[in-house]
């Protein structure tokens, strides 16, 4: 019985450590944007915005995507008080991690964009956006963020062929989320959930085109447009976590240190229990 108990503790430790890493990585900051126009506190817009953010948190425990229109009915005192917004989690996230990511987004967007009539926030695992104008379902391929790795590849025919195969596969999707791999080159892409299949394909084609034009021979790159994104990396050449341009290194370092200390403490307890069971 004691051995079964020890095995259960070990399983719980390694499972929770893996889950924690997955959850923490989804919270990594990618980009944020705030409208220059500001609203006055304690106004109908602020009330509608707070209602939207509360609805987002509630909905994210059940769905990976949802959109909202708050205060846009005829009884609204002013059309400028309406809030249109959406959230979306990366399609491979568990529902619990999606909910945590969205909660983090809500907490951060109010700090990054206080009193803004419009704001957007992209984390590694989720996206949050609201505006006072109705943008829902309307195609928008404006560039929001790009990152090209500092390392590049020259005269490697196999790499570029596999990269282009992956990117062609990504831009052809009409499913909203796609993962692709060719040899050591991997990538994934996603559209917001309210885009039609044809608009999603068009958005991803634009994103892939910008990846090639803006990042050239980079061994890894990511391009985020207003309603879709695409990214790729050569796993044999590149590790995103080692790139000095990758964000949130302080947070990662702290998480690693805390994880190591916690793991060491649990192992000490387990060894002590094993020693006691032998006597």
Swiss-Prot record:
Topology Cytoplasmic: residue spans: 275-279
Residues of the signal peptide: 1-20
One Pfam match: Stress-antifung
Subcellular location: Cell membrane; Cell junction, Plasmodesma
Region (Necessary and sufficient for plasmodesmal targeting): 254-274
Tissue specificity note: Highly expressed in pollen, lateral root and elongation zone. Higher expression in the reproductive tissues (flowers and buds) than in vegetative organs (leaves and stems). High expression in shoot and root phloem companion cells (at protein level).
Side of membrane Extracellular, spans: 21-253
InterPro entries according to UniProt: Cell2Cell_Antifungal, GNK2, GNK2_sf
Gene Ontology annotations for the cellular component aspect, listed alphabetically: plasma membrane; plasmodesma
Keyword Transport attached: yes
Positions of transmembrane segments: 254-274
Chief localisation class: membrane
Residue span(s) of domain Gnk2-homologous: 27-135, 137-237
Subunit structure of this chain's protein: Interacts with ACBP6; interaction occurs at the plasma membrane. (Microbial infection) Interacts with Grapevine fanleaf virus (GFLV) 2B-MP.
Family to which this protein belongs: Belongs to the cysteine-rich repeat secretory protein family. Plasmodesmata-located proteins (PDLD) subfamily.
Function text: Modulates cell-to-cell trafficking.
Protein name from the UniProt record: Plasmodesmata-located protein 8
Gene behind the chain: PDLP8
